């Protein structure tokens, strides 16, 4: 036989080069990990959450080492065993001659090759395992829910805490056995234990025993998988009923099939071992056994359940699936905390504006006119003071008690926007040591405007820029520490270096302007808070120079022995870092608590393995018009359990993070608290009263619950199966074709059935594929506990939904003409939140109308208010303010006569009188007029000319005066024309303005 030439070896230089490159890569990788770990340790120590850092780090290291080592031992051990069991003599054949070359290459360093393979496999297994730290901690620290699943009677805690980690371990075991089997088969083949050519046995006895044992272990693991699959079935989607959880075919066909397959797997595993080694000693019967398992899996686990589903369930699915739909309804409502929802019928039968609108003190006066998204520009322009200050794309809504009266306010913090620094201002020194913080919380009542449509600011003033009467004379929401070092506008690279070299040094941080205009005086400041990591030593400066890849940490004189580094300055990111087990709400909001500006962030505990509960995508369910335009987008996380378990606060000055327990009955939170020592989260009893007064129903939780309730408000299995009573969330009223969902909105108001006005998050829903109103939802806190309420309208209601109401109001001919007057080439009309307010056994709709000039530096001003009562289109007004609009609505109701009620279901409703909306501008050309009527017409013409001139000038104060003059002139003309006269002044502006 011709000897095989050995394969060529790599040159010494090549080996050295590869070794150096690998060494450099490993060195830099370890250096990066080390720097990140060290700086994280310093940061966690400063915020006093080292138990989180150490707990997560130790857990990840243990999982990495344990699973990685186990995988390496299993794979490497089987490689070694396969080589150890190699035959000493191999028959001569062309196949063996070819393999001899590989044996000659591998044999000198076979141990090294096995070690490399084992290390690589173990490394990947360890890296995968360390990412499962959260599953392990819940597995170790989880308890009972106190609720059992409806099929097996097992506590829900098993599914939430134990099952995910058992499934992961099973996956690791499968991977280890498969890799060991592949590796052992390869070694046996290379060293002659397995042959593809030649006569006699193709496999040595030792190789057969080894490989059959691995196959038997694989089949036994399959038996374990079938047992776990019986539990996992309660989490899977039921196509027959369009819900999650095992259905009729699953329980009556697939469930027993899984049990049978588990027993078959055990028998097959024994057969593989026996037939391969103790009896017959060939692969025929083991192969038949494995084929039997495959056929059984297809027939028993596939065809039989399919036949039951197709021929028994589908013809009568409504009845067959009813029991399992009911399970899903109950589990979903429990998992999403909907069990305590208060549902009340609301007839909304009054279709005419009642006189009580004019005397109401709970709903109408509290109607919010300021839209927190639109007036953000207004806040920025009027309260910015310097070009680098910013209020963000959306403001927040909170409530305060000022002078004994509680109402909602639109609030925002004046933050540094590093993107608006000029080229000179944005060098490293200025960006990180001078422009370090914002200043002040600015607030305005949500139901009041002044000075031509501006908010009435009551706090957060800087300089003397406010006009007389356009803002409160004194700060009504004072903050003793108004500086904002931590805010929503802060990004990853926006760190600040604070602290001066000695007490006599001049302050270096820009604090605030103290005079008017861009040329006014400026005051400077030195940070004195407890936050920030000390970086005075050379080692710390070197450490952070490497972390931030910035040499100025070492070279700049701005960094001194007293310097501190403030980083991770976004409140939401700080909470996510100290509590990585929480899902954080996308809309943090600021409040003045004990004189300090404090960020309040809602934290959620979630799970994805609650049996029979509906599974949703968190990102999809929380995305609406405001996502990424003032609210943060959630991750694409699939969940079927959520609780608002934590209220977190971040001090805007020193960055202190505090976690408060809010849902003391949540077993998931208890498990996490136990995992980190038991005192990570403060008790609910420790929440300060002043802080709890500013808690609000979380937006993302409300959106999830609202969307789940669109289906799961139906509690009858039969009705649920038909799907006819499902609801949907309407699109944005003024842009329905955008496909964006209408966001919920915060209001301080009183719904029917509530004893007094309260701060609540509200939303309207419509029937599926229809646009009339189906229900109103509200979320609020009553005595510190969350309360979700639903006002459900009759199915045959004539009340329009938000999209219809907006279209009916804006398409009204006379209102359309007035809106056209407001918009032109020089300005555009913008609509605020369309508020749906149940009142007087009917529906009141309020929609503020803003006008924004097309000129530079322009901002929206509230100019008009659209109001509608009843069905949404019969009683409509466009007024200068809310009080005037309510007055006009009441007058329309009085003219229409006695209130009407809808006829019983099935009867044809009588026609409802449709009063003409009160006009504010003329629309029809009259016959010639003389005398007093002619004088009035001339006044109207002059007012129209002035209105056009004001539009073109972009002067909103002048524009407001012109509108008022036009309204007065029109009223005088109508009075001169006499009752019933159809005469209107000539020269009306065209719809285009």
Swiss-Prot record:
Membrane topology, from the record: Multi-pass membrane protein
Region of interest called Disordered, as start-end residue ranges on this chain: 892-937, 974-993
Pfam families xrefs: UPF0182 (PF03699)
Bias-annotated ranges (Low complexity): 976-993
Residue ranges with Pro residues bias: 900-929
Cellular localization per UniProt: Cell membrane
Keywords (A to Z) from UniProt: Cell membrane, Membrane, Transmembrane, Transmembrane helix
Transmembrane annotation, as ranges: 18-38, 61-81, 110-130, 171-191, 209-229, 260-280, 283-303
InterPro entries in UniProt: UPF0182
GO CC field: extracellular region; plasma membrane
Family: Belongs to the UPF0182 family.
Protein name as annotated: UPF0182 protein Sare_4110
Organism: Salinispora arenicola (strain CNS-205)
């Amino acid at each position: 036989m011709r000897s095989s030439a050995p394969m060529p070896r790599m040159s010494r230089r090549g080996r050295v080069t590869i070794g150096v490159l690998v060494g450099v890569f490993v060195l830099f990788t370890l250096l990066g990990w080390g720097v990140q770990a060290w700086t994280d340790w310093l940061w966690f120590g400063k915020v006093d959450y080292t138990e989180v850092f150490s707990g997560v780090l130790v857990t990840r290291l243990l999982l990495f080492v344990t699973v990685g080592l186990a995988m390496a031992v299993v794979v490497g051990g089987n490689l070694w065993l396969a080589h150890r069991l190699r035959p000493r003599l191999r028959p001569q054949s062309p196949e063996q001659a070819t393999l001899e070359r590989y044996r000659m290459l591998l044999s000198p360093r076979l141990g090294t090759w096995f070690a490399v393979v084992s290390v690589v496999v173990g490394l990947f297994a360890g890296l995968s395992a360390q990412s499962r730290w959260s599953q392990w901690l819940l597995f170790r620290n989880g308890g009972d829910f106190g609720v059992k699943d409806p099929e097996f009677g097992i506590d829900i805690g098993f599914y939430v805490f134990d099952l995910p980690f058992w499934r992961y371990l099973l996956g690791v075991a499968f991977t280890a056995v498969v890799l060991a089997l592949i590796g052992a088969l390869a070694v046996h083949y290379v060293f002659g234990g397995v042959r593809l050519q030649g006569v006699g046995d193709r496999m040595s006895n030792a190789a057969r025993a080894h490989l059959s044992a691995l196959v038997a272990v694989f089949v036994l693991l399959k038996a374990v998988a079938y047992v776990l699959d019986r539990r996992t079935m309660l989490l899977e989607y039921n196509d027959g009923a369009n819900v999650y959880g095992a259905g009729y075919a699953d329980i009556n066909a697939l469930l027993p099939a899984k049990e049978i397959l588990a027993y078959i797997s055990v028998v097959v595993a024994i057969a593989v071992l026996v037939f391969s080694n103790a009896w017959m000693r060939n692969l025929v019967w083991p192969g038949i056994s494995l084929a039997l398992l495959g056929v059984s899996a297809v027939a028993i686990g596939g065809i039989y359940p399919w036949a039951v589903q197709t021929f028994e369930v589908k013809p009568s699915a409504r009845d067959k699936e009813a029991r399992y739909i009911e399970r899903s309804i109950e589990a979903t409502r429990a998992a999403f905390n909907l069990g305590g929802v208060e549902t009340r019928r609301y007839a909304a039968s009054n279709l005419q504006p009642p006189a009580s609108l004019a005397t109401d003190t709970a709903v109408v006066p509290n109607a919010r006119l300021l839209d927190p998204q639109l007036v953000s520009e207004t806040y920025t322009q009027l309260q910015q003071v310097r070009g680098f200050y910013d209020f963000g794309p959306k403001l927040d809504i909170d409530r305060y008690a000022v002078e004994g009266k509680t109402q909602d306010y639109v609030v925002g913090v004046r933050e540094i926007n590093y993107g608006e620094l000029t080229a000179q201002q944005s060098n490293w020194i200025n960006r990180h040591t001078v422009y370090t913080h914002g200043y002040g919380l600015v607030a305005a009542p949500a139901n009041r405007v002044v000075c031509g449509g501006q908010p009435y600011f009551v706090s957060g003033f800087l300089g003397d820029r406010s006009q007389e009467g356009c803002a409160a004379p004194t700060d009504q929401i004072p903050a003793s520490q108004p500086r904002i070092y931590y805010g929503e506008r802060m990004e990853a690279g926006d760190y600040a270096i604070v602290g001066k070299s000695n007490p006599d040094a001049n302050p270096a941080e820009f604090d605030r302007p103290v005079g008017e205009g861009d040329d006014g005086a400026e005051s400077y400041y030195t940070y004195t808070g407890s936050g920030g990591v000390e970086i005075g030593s050379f080692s710390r400066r070197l450490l952070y120079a490497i972390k931030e890849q910035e040499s100025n940490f070492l070279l700049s004189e701005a960094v001194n022995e007293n310097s501190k580094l403030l980083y991770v300055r976004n409140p939401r990111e700080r909470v996510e870092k100290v509590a990585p087990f929480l899902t954080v709400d996308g809309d943090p909001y600021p409040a003045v608590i004990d004189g300090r500006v404090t960020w309040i962030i809602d934290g959620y505990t979630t799970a994805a393995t609650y049996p029979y509960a509906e599974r949703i995508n968190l990102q999809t369910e929380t995305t609406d018009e405001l996502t990424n335009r003032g609210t943060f987008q959630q991750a694409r996380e699939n969940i079927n359990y959520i609780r608002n378990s934590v209220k977190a606060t971040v001090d805007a000055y020193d960055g202190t993070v505090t976690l408060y327990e809010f849902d003391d009955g949540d077993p998931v939170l208890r498990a996490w608290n136990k995992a980190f020592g038991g005192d990570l989260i403060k008790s609910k009893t420790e929440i300060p009263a002043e802080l709890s007064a500013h808690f609000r129903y979380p937006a993302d939780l409300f959106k999830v619950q609202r969307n789940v309730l669109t289906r799961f408000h139906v509690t009858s299995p039969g009705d649920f199966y038909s799907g006819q009573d499902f609801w949907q969330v309407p699109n944005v009223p003024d842009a329905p074709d955008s496909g964006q969902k209408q966001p919920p909105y915060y209001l301080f108001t009183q719904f029917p059935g509530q004893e007094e006005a309260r701060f609540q998050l509200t939303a309207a829903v419509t029937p599926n594929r229809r646009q009339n109103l189906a229900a109103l939802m509200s979320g609020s806190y009553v005595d510190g506990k969350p309360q979700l309420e639903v006002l459900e309208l009759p199915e045959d209601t004539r009340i329009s939904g938000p999209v219809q109401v907006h279209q009916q109001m804006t398409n009204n001919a006379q209102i359309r003409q007035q809106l056209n007057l407001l918009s032109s080439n020089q300005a555009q009309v913008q609509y605020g939140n369309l508020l749906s307010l149940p009142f007087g056994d009917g529906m009141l709709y309020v929609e503020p109308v803003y006008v924004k000039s097309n000129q530079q530096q322009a901002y929206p001003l509230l100019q008009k208010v659209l109001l509608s009562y009843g069905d949404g289109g019969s009683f409509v007004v466009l007024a200068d303010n809310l009080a005037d609009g309510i007055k006009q609505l009441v007058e329309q109701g009085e003219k229409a006569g006695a209130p009407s009620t809808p006829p019983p279901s099935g009867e044809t409703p009588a026609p409802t009188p449709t009063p003409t909306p009160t006009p504010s501008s003329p629309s029809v050309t009259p016959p010639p007029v003389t005398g007093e009527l002619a004088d009035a017409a001339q006044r109207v013409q002059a007012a129209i000319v002035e209105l056009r001139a004001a539009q073109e000038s972009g002067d909103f104060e002048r524009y407001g005066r012109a509108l008022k003059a036009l309204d007065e002139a029109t009223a005088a003309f109508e009075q001169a024309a006499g009752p019933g006269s159809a005469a209107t002044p000539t020269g009306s502006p065209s719809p285009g303005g």
